Amino acid sequence: MPDDIRARRRAGTGLGVLLALALGAVLLTALPDDGEREGGAACGPRTVGSWSAERALTDEFARYGDDPSRADDWTGGDGTHSVRLPDGRLLWLFSDTYLGQVHPPPNPFGESSTWREGAAPLVRNSAVVMRDGRLESTLPAPLFPDPAPGQWRWPVAAHVEPRSPGAPERVLRVLLWVRAAGPSPWIYGVPVATEVATLSLPDLRVESVVRVADQQGVPDPSRRVLYGTTLVEEDGWTYVFGGDDRRAASRPVSRAYLARVPRGRLGEPDAWRYWDGSGWG
């Protein structure tokens, strides 16, 4: 059976298990202390301390993904990120996402499992709202439309911050990776740029998308850097971590990168500063 058809018939349950494993992992991430930031000893690597399956979360995604009552909601996705909203809701962000319906067993492939039709809609990104541990709704998908033919946006880290420094109003800012279709080895797309989307709160309406780090001028795609693998706020700065795609081009290792932005200015390209190993450029 072709791999694409096999993948399409899977229900949300499988994703939920993977999601639980990823969320159960205890990842230790830290910024260097003041001395290290100014060129002192490099911070040591961090490793996974432990992990365990989050059964309640797995079951909730299985319930929501396998619900056959709607034809326009999430039934499975990858590239999972989440962000807590000021009103207590949790917003789940996904990259490639299946919509449509999931059907109960038996399925036409002869297995006793739920199944998804081969013509199920696939979008490049989606967002699902959770309240008090229960998934409520899928926002209109794709939430972030393709920037150009042959290109798409994958959401990564997200952060609630003031609309501008010191402003009382808060907004949600979502880091986006822009990729473009390309030949092997770029099976996940050629890196193009990092963007920042601003969403209003509490209605989660996309107000704008701004390109903050365009990489199209870097000739070697494996050296193009995308930001947003994760982020952390400290001392009035938002630190944004990123990386390149050297391993996609069979290089030994990919490299990590770091940028920082004053709190409230993630959507301003001129406010971004990049660590070059000895200072912020």
Where are the model-predicted features located?
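N-terminal regions that are enriched for targeting/export leaders
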Residues: A30-R179, V190
